[in-house]
Amino acid sequence: NMYFAMLSKVAFEDGKIVEHWDNLQEKPTQPNPSNRTMIDGTTEVKDLAKTEENKALVKSFVTDILVNGKMEKIANYFDGDNYIQHNPQIADGLSGLGKALEYMASQGITMRFHKIHKVLGEGNFVLTVSEGTFADKPTSFYDLFRVENGKIAEHWDVMETIIPEADRKNTNGKF
């Protein structure tokens, strides 16, 4: 059996679903190095008054670090090494993220974010929908962040290879 993790976004008009987008990734059978999975973790939405502030923080992080590669700014977005990671391959903390990026580089695996398409949020949760490449393949990135005390505290993600236009069943596009 194969199991998948999926992040979805849905557009409503007059209380009815009018559009749906999702990202789908095979869910590993084992937890990540910190014993976390792609589907566990905090779920309580709070700090509703900080929604716009949290969206701005996460957009700035994705722009500075993931799109523009300004790694010298990364510590500004986290509370030291306190960072809960749900990516199947990455351990908790900035140290875990650093080790994963070093390993990918040593294997010649590149990950590049080219464009943020959407930043959606409510309270302490912010979702970014981005486009780029992973291992030289066009990829869509759905990254869900939990913000606490003005810092990124937790992260989930689902990456999906974007199929070529010639293989698509419609012209709606991924974004």
Name what the model sees in each region.
Residues 1-175:
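C-terminal and inter-domain tail/linker signature
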